[in-house]
């Protein structure tokens, strides 16, 4: 079979774009905590010494946005100008307006009710925008995620962990990881290259201190976890590149401006699946960019967990103000155990993909989003990540005739 290399990347919570994502979702959580019906679309820009928050919100809740911003920045680890940013002293600018009544009309009273007179409660809420969303799952890891993004996220999480627990005390919050894996056909067989770039204190020698510490306490630690998880991958002789520029002292918002929604491939499947283009952070679940993408992950993961396919990508599409999806597409890449049309029909029978039904079934009107904003929205089986449940396996198998 043909051999090929596939690469995915991740970033730490201290990357400027991820700081912005976490701030946006922290504000969302604060509003949902007081008013679960809040409509929120919050964007964050972060640059040297300044955080600017803008967007549209309709809510009965109050949020002390400057205080939320500062606490989140400090929690991430930016507490000194020596690190390039200080949450205690940075400026915070807020420009929040109300949601457009034209959008609210379509969300609050869907096309099905306004035009067709439908009285079904779940038909009353329309999609918050038009758009297309993808979900993906495969059997490369126990979490049914692609292996390259799985490993890249683990490396990024570990990079932050060794900084926070003092194992590598001279690290700073900003960091990136990248993983290249060799595939034989569709099977991951060998780790080819690992890239780790981490912000660090001044006067740290790359060759004698940083690179050996990263190899021992970050990379080898993660590779040992893969073995514990039963993932078979040849890791002998992999290439490790640590801070290939030679130095990474200036980082965080001082090194690069950060924006909400700039890491959508890292947030999802690391490039292994297609993406509809919509970002997640700062958006309440009436926005199908977020809620339907979560639902598609739920669908695809249940399809693979049910044994209907080894790889599954699902696309859904919506029209603004309409409850029912306008399109559903299933791709199994030649791995289906039954006819793909049967899988598509089974999905339609088992899953209700109207926005109100997604919000109900995944219990999305909760303050759960800040924890999604770093290290991936998918593949982490945390209690609040309801879209990672495989609770429709039996129903799918029955509907597909297995």
Curated annotation (Swiss-Prot):
Catalytic activity: L-methionine + ATP + H2O = S-adenosyl-L-methionine + phosphate + diphosphate
Annotated spans, Flexible loop: 99-109
Protein's pathway: Amino-acid biosynthesis; S-adenosyl-L-methionine biosynthesis; S-adenosyl-L-methionine from L-methionine: step 1/1
InterPro entries with a match to the protein in the record: ADOMET_SYNTHASE_CS, S-AdoMet_synt_C, S-AdoMet_synt_central, S-AdoMet_synt_N, S-AdoMet_synthetase, S-AdoMet_synthetase_sfam
PROSITE patterns the record matches: ADOMET_SYNTHASE_1, ADOMET_SYNTHASE_2
CDD domains in the record: S-AdoMet_synt (cd18079)
Physiological role: Catalyzes the formation of S-adenosylmethionine (AdoMet) from methionine and ATP. The overall synthetic reaction is composed of two sequential steps, AdoMet formation and the subsequent tripolyphosphate hydrolysis which occurs prior to release of AdoMet from the enzyme.
Family matches, as HAMAP family: S_AdoMet_synth1 (MF_00086)
Protein name according to UniProt: S-adenosylmethionine synthase
Source organism (scientific name): Streptomyces griseus subsp. griseus (strain JCM 4626 / CBS 651.72 / NBRC 13350 / KCC S-0626 / ISP 5235)
Gene name tied to this protein: metK
